[in-house]
Curated annotation (Swiss-Prot):
Keywords: Cytoplasm, Hydrolase, Protease, Thiol protease
HAMAP family: Pyrrolid_peptidase
Pfam name, any one: Peptidase_C15
Protein EC: 3.4.19.3
Active-site residues from the entry: E78, C141, H165
Gene Ontology cellular component terms for the protein in this record: cytosol
Catalysis performed (reactions): Release of an N-terminal pyroglutamyl group from a polypeptide, the second amino acid generally not being Pro
Principal location class: cytoplasm
Cysteines joined through disulfide linkages: none
SUPFAM superfamilies: Pyrrolidone carboxyl peptidase (pyroglutamate aminopeptidase)
Name of the protein this chain belongs to: Pyrrolidone-carboxylate peptidase
Record function comment: Removes 5-oxoproline from various penultimate amino acid residues except L-proline.
Length: 215
């Protein structure tokens, strides 16, 4: 099994991005799966262009995109990506699309095809906080998740794809009182646990367990 992992460069005034720092620490093989990690720019469309190049060349069985969600308290596999860019802040090249479809020929939304509930369970078993998230936002994270599912559907129809948000690293919240954070080793360990679940559930349906929210 081949798994493509992506991590964004720093954005929004941050000097580091835990997504990129964590994937740099991943081993080349996890649970028998070949792991390829790539950096993507926090830029609308350009991030998808980089991803497309690697999907076409690597032909992965699964794509897991990782992104920073400052303020979240645990690792959060995303359930759905919507066909809409609505940027609260500019991306790293100054683009700030508002109410703009990501793909004119795409679906209104794509659901993750990764085993998100099994991923949460595996992260819990590793002793770390995790939950299913029902919104990936409307910035570049949602953009890339949507594009990943669109591209996999087009170029690797038998592959699975999805996205997982992770918290700030400890050093990012030194000047952010009462903001949740996690140390880098634990973030990396959580990502590895999620990858274990992706491999384990390659040929079977996701777990049936509560993962919803009331609001």
């Amino acid at each position: 099994m081949k798994i493509l992992i992506t991590g964004f460069d720093p954005f929004g005034g941050e000097a580091i991005n835990p997504a990129l720092e964590a994937i740099k620490k991943l081993p080349a093989t996890i649970h028998g799966a070949e792991i390829k990690c790539i950096e993507v720019p926090t830029v609308f469309q350009k991030s998808a262009d980089v991803l497309q190049q690697h999907i076409e060349s690597f032909q992965p069985d699964a794509v897991l995109c990782i992104g920073q969600a400052g303020g979240r308290t645990g690792l959060t596999p995303e359930r759905v990506a919507i066909n809409q860019d609505d940027a609260r802040i500019p991306d790293n090249e100054g683009n700030q699309p508002i109410d703009t479809p990501i793909r004119a020929d795409g679906k209104a939304a794509y659901f993750s095809t990764l085993p998100i509930k099994a991923m949460v369970a595996a992260i819990h078993q590793a002793g770390l906080p995790a939950s299913v998230s029902n919104t990936a936002g409307t910035f570049v994270c949602n953009h890339l998740m949507y594009q990943a599912l669109y591209l996999v559907d087009k170029y690797c129809p038998n592959a699975k794809a999805g996205f997982m948000h992770i918290p700030f690293m400890m050093e990012q919240v030194v000047d952010k009182p009462n903001t949740a954070a996690m140390n880098l080793d634990d973030i990396t360990r959580g990502i590895e646990a999620a990858i274990f679940a992706i491999v384990d559930f390659k040929d079977r349906s996701d777990l049936k367990r509560v993962g919803g929210a009331t609001h």
